[in-house]
């Protein structure tokens, strides 16, 4: 009977919680702002963790790159903080990536809304022409 979650998934969940707390409490750089950790992917050998983040209230590409760079420079420090929370032999190396899925989701949602509105207007036009 297979397990519902493998070890790398459990470590990823624990790292996500620990990193969220560590970034909020330990990172004092105002350029980073409010960070939302969307996902953490840990390799099967538990050596590397990819952390996907977004920044609340930041839309500027340059500011996003700066914030990701700051987080990557602090990755060693954050790894040390996380290692104190986790009870595993070695803590995965951390690398931060900007998560573009939220932005893509908003674009797709607006496209769908626009298509629905156009479809409704075409159906109303067709209904109006049939009555005449």
Curated annotation (Swiss-Prot):
Keywords: Cytoplasm, Ribosome biogenesis. InterPro entries: KH_dom-like_a/b, RbfA, RbfA_dom_sf, Ribosome-bd_factorA_CS. Transmembrane segments: none annotated. Gene3D superfamilies: 3.30.300.20. GO terms for biological process: maturation of SSU-rRNA. GO terms for molecular function: ribosomal small subunit binding. The keyword Transmembrane helix does not apply. Belongs to the RbfA family. One of several proteins that assist in the late maturation steps of the functional core of the 30S ribosomal subunit. Associates with free 30S ribosomal subunits (but not with 30S subunits that are part of 70S ribosomes or polysomes). Required for efficient processing of 16S rRNA. May interact with the 5'-terminal helix region of 16S rRNA. This is Ribosome-binding factor A. It comes from Teredinibacter turnerae (strain ATCC 39867 / T7901). The lineage of its organism: Bacteria, Pseudomonadati, Pseudomonadota, Gammaproteobacteria, Cellvibrionales. The gene is rbfA.
């Amino acid at each position: 009977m297979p397990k519902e979650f493998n070890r790398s998934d459990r470590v990823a969940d624990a790292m996500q919680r620990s990193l969220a707390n560590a970034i909020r409490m330990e990172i004092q750089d105002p350029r980073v702002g409010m960070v939302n950790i969307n996902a953490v992917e840990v390799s099967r050998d538990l050596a590397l963790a990819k952390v996907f983040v977004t920044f609340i209230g930041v839309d500027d590409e340059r500011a996003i790159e700066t914030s990701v760079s700051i987080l990557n420079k602090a990755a060693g420090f954050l790894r040390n903080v996380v290692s104190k929370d986790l009870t595993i032999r070695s803590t995965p190396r951390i690398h931060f990536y900007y998560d573009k899925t939220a932005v893509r989701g908003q674009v797709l949602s607006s496209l769908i809304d626009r298509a629905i509105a156009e479809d409704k207007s075409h159906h109303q036009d067709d209904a109006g022409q049939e009555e005449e």
